[in-house]
Amino acid sequence: MSVKIRKGDLVQVITGSKTGGKKGKQGRVLAVSGDRVWVEGVNLTTRHRKRVTNDKGTSSGGLEKRESPMHISNVALVDPETGAPTKVGFLVKTSGDKTVRVRFAKKSGKELT
């Protein structure tokens, strides 16, 4: 399967009941693992961490908010020109003897880096 969404991309939540009603929210991709994606500021869950004191006498623990994974089909890449969700296509470019696959936004045709 081709990797259409990568770490650092700006994506928008397009659907999904497990996303906590965050349809339409945009954020940067923190990580991608298989068919799961972590989006910054979206699908936050609260983790309860046990309070632990380290050697210096400071303690850490309590409630911690962090992003949870969601299915990659629930997000779409944001077009850099229009700011709307778009599909991703691939172009094969040849320069000399090298061939490179480049992602592009299907709505505007602009190349994605």
UniProtKB/Swiss-Prot annotation:
Pfam families cross-referenced by the UniProt entry: ribosomal_L24 (PF17136)
Region (Disordered) residue spans: 48-70
Entry's Gene Ontology molecular function annotations: rRNA binding; structural constituent of ribosome
Swiss-Prot/TrEMBL keywords: Ribonucleoprotein, Ribosomal protein, RNA-binding, rRNA-binding
SUPFAM superfamilies: Translation proteins SH3-like domain (SSF50104)
Record-level GO BP terms: translation
Gene3D superfamilies per the UniProt record, alphabetical: 2.30.30.30
Superkingdom classification of source: Bacteria
GO cellular component, one term: ribonucleoprotein complex
Similarity-based family: Belongs to the universal ribosomal protein uL24 family.
Its biological purpose: One of two assembly initiator proteins, it binds directly to the 5'-end of the 23S rRNA, where it nucleates assembly of the 50S subunit. One of the proteins that surrounds the polypeptide exit tunnel on the outside of the subunit.
Assembly: Part of the 50S ribosomal subunit.
Name of this protein: Large ribosomal subunit protein uL24
Source taxonomy: Bacteria, Bacillati, Actinomycetota, Actinomycetes, Micrococcales
The gene coding this protein: rplX
